[in-house]
């Protein structure tokens, strides 16, 4: 999705008003994009306030769009204009290779702190020997379930998608019969956006259908196992998942689950602390497990997610901006965010921290899920990844919405990807 140049100019013209000041006026004023709504924004606000008090600088918050697709479009237009309006930006795990030319090298400021973080993420954030972003938190898709409902109906957490469908249908129908007409079996992210790419990569991988392209950049998505995965997911729509799921993002799915109206949910780790919050209807009733396998011969798969923080090379205060990045990605801040917000740390030592594990018991039992998550193929497809992902999520959405069969959609997708690739990614 593209943001018009006129819209960008409007944003740029009013950006000073869009920012909310969080400290007194001193040395430098650093503007940061790091949280859009709710808990995410509040954590961003608190952390930047703390840094401002420690350093005497001023921090202003810019609230980015909620959609990752829209955020990237906005940043790209700001980079094209060489705008200095934003000093620090939040960077999705698949973006570093796409925007590397617009970010400063953080190594002169990190003092080796990156060595504490997961090496694979640091490598992802390194381009041409430059550390262009610091890991902020990592993510991997998880299965949330109502452990009280499973126990009530004599079921266990499913290990395959087939088991999930059967259990979801059984409990959904029973709960509706008992009076909850709004009960759904399974909610997830099926809107046509990057979140659907994440979900669908998990489905493909779990059935042995590979990824959109392989590590060498070869287009592999058009295969029978991938078709099986998408056909299976399409069978959920209107049976165990509401048709409205075709317009669900993460927060839409969480809203249904947290209101007590879903048996299962696919979402990121952040949903744990919110689901167990004071205003949640299902506090203490949530279980978490790895996402199911694609049949008995399949495997568990979780898409790698997560966010980084980086400094724009157009910033007028790179040293101060880098200082803020290093503070926000530090062990002390990551620990606090893990305990209070269930944000997965990118620092391995924190997965052995008692306070972190007490707040998030699944961090220990599902540690392997987080360290072996499946990447989207941004490295293999380079600057063309946004086109690749958009083609994939649109093809998947066509299958889920019944507009095309999995086989036809994947064949068409293969042709589209060949056009995008041409001679090389």
PLM feature segments, named:
Residues 28-38, 57-64, 87-88, 132, ...:
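Short, well-ordered beta-strand elements
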Residues 29-46, 64-66, 139, 194, ...:
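Extracytoplasmic "Venus flytrap"
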Residues 31, 47-119, 124-126, 148-159, ...:
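Extracytoplasmic "Venus flytrap"/periplasmic binding protein-like
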Residues 53-54, 58, 151, 371-425:
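Conserved C-terminal helix/tail region of periplasmic/extracytoplasmic solute-binding proteins
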Residues 92-140, 156, 181-182, 196-199, ...:
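Hinge/lid segment of periplasmic solute-binding proteins
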Residues 120-125, 289-290, 339-391, 398, ...:
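Long, aromatic- and glycine/proline-rich binding clefts that accommodate carbohydrate-like moieties
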Residues 132-136, 141, 165-218, 262:
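Extracytoplasmic/periplasmic solute-binding protein
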Residues 168, 215-246, 291:
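Glycine-centered hinge/linker elements that transmit conformational signals in sensory
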């Amino acid at each position: 999705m593209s943001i018009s140049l006129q819209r960008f100019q409007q944003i740029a013209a009013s950006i000073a008003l869009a920012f909310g000041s969080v400290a007194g006026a001193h040395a430098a004023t650093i503007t940061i994009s790091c949280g859009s709504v709710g808990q995410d924004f509040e954590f961003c606000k608190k952390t930047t306030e703390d840094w401002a008090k420690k350093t005497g600088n001023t921090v202003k918050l810019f609230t980015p769009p909620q959609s990752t697709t829209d955020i990237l479009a906005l940043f790209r237009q700001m980079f094209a204009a060489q705008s200095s309006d934003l000093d620090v930006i939040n960077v999705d795990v698949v973006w570093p290779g796409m925007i590397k030319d617009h970010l400063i090298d953080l190594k002169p400021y990190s003092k080796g702190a990156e060595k504490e973080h997961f090496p694979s993420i640091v490598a992802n954030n390194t381009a041409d020997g430059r550390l262009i972003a610091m890991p902020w938190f990592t993510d991997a898709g998880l299965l949330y379930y109502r452990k009280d409902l499973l126990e009530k109906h004599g079921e266990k957490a499913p290990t395959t998608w087939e088991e999930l469908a059967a259990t979801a249908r059984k409990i959904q129908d029973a709960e509706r019969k008992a009076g909850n007409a709004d009960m759904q079996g399974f909610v997830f992210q099926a809107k046509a956006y990057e979140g659907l790419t994440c979900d669908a990569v998990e489905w493909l991988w779990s059935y042995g259908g590979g990824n959109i392209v392989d590590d060498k950049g070869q287009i592999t998505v058009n295969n029978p196992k991938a078709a099986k995965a998408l056909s299976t997911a399409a069978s959920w729509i209107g049976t165990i998942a509401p048709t409205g799921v075709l317009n669900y993002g993460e927060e839409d799915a969480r809203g249904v689950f947290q209101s007590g109206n879903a048996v299962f949910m696919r979402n990121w780790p952040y949903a744990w602390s919110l689901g167990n919050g004071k205003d949640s209807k299902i506090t203490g009733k949530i279980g978490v497990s790895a996402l199911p396998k694609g049949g008995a011969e399949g495997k568990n798969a979780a898409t790698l997610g997560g966010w980084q923080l980086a400094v724009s090379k157009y910033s007028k205060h790179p040293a101060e901006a880098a200082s803020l990045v290093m503070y926000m990605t530090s062990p002390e801040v990551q620990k606090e965010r893990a305990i209070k917000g269930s944000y997965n740390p990118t620092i391995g030592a924190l997965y052995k921290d008692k306070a972190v594990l007490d707040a998030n018991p699944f961090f220990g039992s599902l540690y392997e899920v987080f360290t072996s998550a499946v990447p989207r193929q941004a490295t293999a497809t380079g600057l063309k990844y946004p086109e690749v992902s958009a083609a994939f999520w649109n093809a998947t959405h066509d299958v889920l919405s019944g507009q095309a069969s999995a086989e036809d959609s994947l064949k068409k997708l293969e042709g589209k990807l060949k056009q995008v690739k041409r001679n090389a990614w």
